Structure formats: structure tokens, C-alpha cells
Amino acid sequence: VPEASTAHEVTPVRTTPESRVFSPAAVVASCGGFVLIGALQALYGPSIPAFRDDFALSPSAAGLGLSAHFVGGVAGVLVFDRLYGRLGNRLLLGSSYLLMALGAAGFALAPTWPVALVAALLAGLGFGGIDYGLNQLFAVGFGHRSTAMLNILNAHFGVGAILGPALVAAVGAEHYPALFLAFAAANLPLLLCLRGVRDQVPQPVPGTTGTAAGGSPLSRSLGSVLAVFVALYVLHVGIEAGVGGWEPTHLEAVGYGAGAAATATSGYWLMMTAGRFLAAPLALRHSPRTIITVSCAGMTVCLLLASVPALAPYAYAGVGLFIAPIFPTGLPWLNAAAPRARRAGALVIAASMIGGVAAGPALGKAIEWSGVRAVPLLLDAVSALCLLATLWLIRATRPPSPLPSLSPLPSPSPVRSPAP
């Protein structure tokens, strides 16, 4: 029995004014929430020199702040998913915003580094709840427009990720407590907009149930689909983090100055943000599988071109453009391909966070063996795996062709007796 028999497309929910999940004000507030979580994640890195001065830390100890944030993020995804459907969406999102605010304020006011790490963990817990909660609700809350809305939502994360370091540069890393306190205060107005979020969301009605002939799902096949989705998310987020972390080093190694390398890396992040805004109208015309296939193919070509020094800065910008839609576009595809796997979204989002954390050390080990100049080729090999995973998922989630109906045999013509 082919594995495609247990993971099929479903008919998306058509939203009506009575069934919509978000009011217009809540949509705007949700995008604002994603600006905040993007900024929060991006505040830690540029503030590390100030952490070291204030708490007399080694570089590795100072880096634990971001690690605590990511650990809290993974825990927040898993906790939110466990409570999703049991508690109302407003309560869960409101609790997540409050945890982020309390954690950020605690980090700003912490008297010792261990207290600061606990606060970063708390802020990360709220970060994970917002990240998973809004992604999950946007994936099911806009019917056929969900993919487009997810791209817009995640584009605002990129806006925050660009805004955070810019604020640190503007006010100085030594003033990081003021930035974290301002971030904490910015969470509070968003609580007022939660009245526009529906507490319970409509569930998609499968067009095909994905069950075997006897009515029970073939769990091995569904497990394979989920495993490949997880692999796709871990690998592409690893590429995203790998380019962001190692592009400046690679460009300097092939002859670019530090300023030019930093500018090119900023261009990569800008293109990734722009790519998600650009993908929104495309998502209304093309299926998620088509968008992700083109994205993986384009990303693979651009990483190959990045190995040519003269083309590298422009090729990395192309990587940002093509990688942009994969994360938000994959979630509706996952929900459609595995409608019975309720925790599938939490699994891939948590896995993507782990992939982002693991990408730096893993790529660093590979670079020790192959050299910095091999960075684009190493990432290109990972991108090729993303493309293969996408092609496998297209085959595995394709609805089976209906059996051809047998035409009834024509009835025999009556035998006419010869005329007398």
C-alpha cells in the first residue's frame, strides 16, 4: 500500500463573519505581537558586551542568555499546545504576553546573572506561546487566505528582528535595561485587543479522512509524513540561521571588507522580510506545495552561486528572498496533509527552534573540517535535502486517483425476425 494513502489534502474552512477567528483590530495587534517577539529575540545578541561588563561574564556565559530564551521558547510551544483547546485562546495568548512582559522586565532589573537567566527563560516561555499560538490560529482562521495571512504575520517577525539591533545601536548596548523595560511595556496594550480573538476556532472538515479501508489511520505512514515535515523545518531553519550567522565571515574570507559584509548580511534579512510580504499575494493563486518547491529550488541555486565571490552578496540576498515563504507556507500544508495529527504544528515549530540553535555549532564543526570558503556549498547540500524532502511530501500527500468506473456493457440489440 503506498504511503500516500494516509495523508491527503483537506478542504479549507471558509470563514464567515460569524465564524471568523480574528477581528481586524486583533489581526493588527497580532502582527504587532510578532514585531515584538522578533525584536525580543534580536535584542540579546547586540547586548552581550553590556552583559559581560555588568556581570563580569565570559563570552560563553553571556551567550547563555539567548540559550535560556530558546529553551523557554521550546517549552512555551509545548505547553501552549498541551493547553490548546482546553483553555480559551484569549487566556492562553494573554498569559503568553504577560509572561513575555514579566520576563523582559525581570531581565532588565535582575541583580545577578542567574536571576537574569531565569527571567530570560520566563520571557522565552511567553515567546513560544505567542509564536505557536498565533501561527496555529492564523493557519486555520482565514480559510483559503490562511497561507497569505501567515506570510504577512511572519514578515512582521522580520520587521522586529531588524528593529531590535537598530534600537541597540541607536541608544547603546549599555542601556539595554531601558530597551527591555520598553519592550515589556509594549506588550501590555496588546492585551486590550484580545477581545477580538475567538476563544474556540472552527475545525477543518476533511475532504478525505486519510484512513485505511478499515477506518483506522495507518500510523506508520502518517508518522513518515510528520517526520519529513520536521526534517524540512529543521533543515531550512538551519540554513536561515547558518546564512545569518556565517555570511559575514564567508564574505570577509573571500575579500570583502567588514562593513560591506555587514551590509550584505542586513540585505539578507531585509530580503527575507520582503519575501514574506511578496509571498502573500502569490499564496492566493498558488498551492503551498508549489510555493515551497520553487522556494527550495531557488534557494539551492542561489547558495550554489554564493560560492562565486563576485556574486556572493547578491546570491545571499536571493537566498533570503527564496527561503522566506517556507516556514509560514508549510503550516497550512501540514494541517491539510495531517488533519488528525493535532500536535503536528507544535512539533514542527519546536523542532525549528531546536534546528536554529543547533545550526551554529553544527556548521562550525563542518567549517573546521572544510574551511570558511565552503560555507555556501555546505549550506547548498542542506538546501538540496530540503528540495528532496519537499518532492517526497508532494508525492506522499497527493490524493489518490479515483478508480475508473466501469462502463456498463451495452444491452444486446433485439434480434429482428426477417420480414415475410
Feature map (PLM): residue ranges:
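Extracytoplasmic gate region of multi-pass secondary transporters
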Residues: 44-45, 222-274
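Conserved MFS/SLC helix-loop-helix module at the cytosolic interface between two early adjacent transmembrane helices
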Residues: 75-114
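Helix-to-loop junctions at the C-terminal end of transmembrane segments
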Residues: 76-89, 172, 275-288, 367-368
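Cytoplasmic helix-loop-helix junction between adjacent transmembrane helices
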Residues: 119-155
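Intracellular juxtamembrane helix-capping segments at the cytosolic ends
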Residues: 129-142, 324-339
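Helix-loop-helix hairpin linking two adjacent transmembrane segments in secondary transporters
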Residues: 144-145, 152-199
